[in-house]
Amino acid sequence: MASTGASRSLAASPRPPQGRSSRQDKYSVLLPTYNERENLPLIVWLLVKSFSESAINYEIIIIDDGSPDGTREVAEQLAEIYGPDRILLRPREKKLGLGTAYIHGIKHATGNYVIIMDADLSHHPKFIPEFIRKQKEGNFDIVSGTRYKGNGGVYGWDLKRKIISRGANFITQILLRPGASDLTGSFRLYRKEVLQKLIEKCVSKGYVFQMEMIVRARQMNYTIGEVPISFVDRVYGESKLGGNEIVSFLKGLLTLFATT
């Protein structure tokens, strides 16, 4: 269960205004979670704050993969606090991977735009209004957050991890020529119908799924805008990126190079 202090502060937050026009754009946030009980209350609070202050119509869909740490129970509390029309819990019984989590989540999305992001506070919701402005300005099909353009950056990583990340991104740029500066990032805004079509085409699982989405988007001539973001390493919990994920990334990169 979430801590008493966190629950009190969340409960004190005003509910977002209701009764918006059905013709207004609506944004569905997909939040896959696994062992994120410490991070989930704060990321949801930040999302609600950002959307409410900008008068943006939204819903937050939490896809929990059977977390043993009580993440699901925290999500249930958040739905009670903010309302089941704003916080939708759509859990799965076990850990099935990031790509299938998005497939599961989009089935329940009622917005005409879908935002995907990490639940571990690596992606700050303060950038979402800028994503939306960028999409409107260029009428883009996709807006992707980038760590490698403009004033974007990474914070909290040691030098070794930064070099690995930069190196991986450099290699993918050479091999795949994706038309985007940050191929491995996971903070994006999609038109819902575009995301649905891309999901149908993608075959990768896990973290490679994000990379394939941009590559397939280029193949299908979808337009991509970019917004520089600050990526901050998680404060609570453990990183999901391990040796198996790195091997999967390399295999996925070679597969995409051979098939695209």
Swiss-Prot record:
GO cellular component terms given for this protein: dolichol-phosphate-mannose synthase complex; endoplasmic reticulum; endoplasmic reticulum membrane; membrane
CDD domains cross-referenced by the UniProt entry: DPM1_like
Pfam family, one: Glycos_transf_2
Binding site for Mn(2+): 120
PTM-bearing positions, type Phosphoserine: 3, 9
InterPro entries: DPM1-like, Glyco_trans_2-like, Nucleotide-diphossugar_trans
Modified residues (N-acetylalanine): 2
Cofactor binding note: Binds 1 divalent metal cation.
Leading EC class: transferase
GO biological process, one term: GPI anchor biosynthetic process
Superkingdom as given in the UniProt entry: Eukaryota
Catalysed transformations (reactions): a di-trans,poly-cis-dolichyl phosphate + GDP-alpha-D-mannose = a di-trans,poly-cis-dolichyl beta-D-mannosyl phosphate + GDP
Keyword Cell membrane: no
Renumbered residue ranges of the record's region Disordered: 1-25
GO molecular function, one term: alcohol binding
Main localisation: endoplasmic reticulum
E.C. designation(s): 2.4.1.83
Binding annotation for GDP-alpha-D-mannose: 32, 34, 36, 63, 65, 118-120, 147, 234, 240
Cofactor or coenzyme needed: Mg(2+); Mn(2+); Ca(2+)
Pathway field: Protein modification; protein glycosylation
SUBUNIT field: Component of the dolichol-phosphate mannose (DPM) synthase complex composed of DPM1, DPM2 and DPM3; within the complex, directly interacts with DPM3. This interaction may stabilize DPM1.
Role description: Transfers mannose from GDP-mannose to dolichol monophosphate to form dolichol phosphate mannose (Dol-P-Man) which is the mannosyl donor in pathways leading to N-glycosylation, glycosyl phosphatidylinositol membrane anchoring, and O-mannosylation of proteins; catalytic subunit of the dolichol-phosphate mannose (DPM) synthase complex.
Family: Belongs to the glycosyltransferase 2 family.
Protein known as: Dolichol-phosphate mannosyltransferase subunit 1
